[in-house]
Curated annotation (Swiss-Prot):
Superkingdom, natural source: Eukaryota
Protein name, entry field: Myosin regulatory light chain 12B
Binding of Ca(2+), residues: D41, N43, D45, D52
Species lineage: Eukaryota, Metazoa, Chordata, Craniata, Vertebrata
GO terms for biological process, alphabetical: regulation of cell shape
PROSITE patterns for the chain: EF_HAND_1, EF_HAND_2
Quaternary structure, from the entry: Myosin is a hexamer of 2 heavy chains and 4 light chains: interacts with myosin heavy chain MYO19.
């Protein structure tokens, strides 16, 4: 007696993201996203794939190219299940950049590539360049920021907190 399992799905399981994406939206918004997801998931397999996108766009009178569909699919780091769908929309709607973009922006001012920036230097940058912060805004930022006893702002940890929330004290 052979115990071969029938292969019903060839999709690999999406990587689990430690994300508080469900906390970003209220219950009615999540329900609306679920309805939108189900409308796009034409074959009802719980994932949005290239064919689902094609069928959905075709139903809207569009004729997307394969390259266009491929570019859309490549915005996700893996298969698009509902959590991934919500995460992608959450980032777009929240207006926050992806984690690596934020980290790289800080890294421009980290000449020694230590993952930290001296807090006084960062304050100067934030209050004199670009969309200038007030001193009060910098103080507010520093209140919960990962700054060591030497006054080094850990932008790698800060970026992680910004995108995923603070670690629990037990971690």
């Amino acid at each position: 007696m052979s115990s071969k399992k029938a292969k019903t799905k060839t999709k690999k399981r999406p990587q689990r993201a430690t994300s508080n994406v469900f906390a970003m939206f209220d219950q009615s918004q999540i329900q609306e996203f679920k309805e939108a997801f189900n409308m796009i998931d034409q074959n009802r397999d719980g994932f949005i794939d290239k064919e689902d996108l094609h069928d959905m766009l075709a139903s809207l009178g569009k004729n997307p190219t394969d390259a266009y569909l491929e570019a859309m699919m490549n915005e996700a780091p893996g298969p698009i299940n509902f959590t991934m769908f919500l995460t992608m929309f959450g980032e777009k709607l929240n207006g926050t950049d992806p984690e690596d973009v934020i980290r790289n922006a800080f890294a421009c001012f980290d000449e020694e590539a230590t993952g930290t920036i001296q807090e006084d230097y960062l304050r100067e940058l934030l209050t004199t360049m670009g969309d200038r912060f007030t001193d009060e805004e910098v103080d507010e930022l520093y209140r919960e920021a990962p700054i060591d006893k030497k006054g080094n702002f850990n932008y790698i940890e800060f970026t992680r907190i910004l995108k995923h929330g603070a670690k629990d004290k037990d971690d």
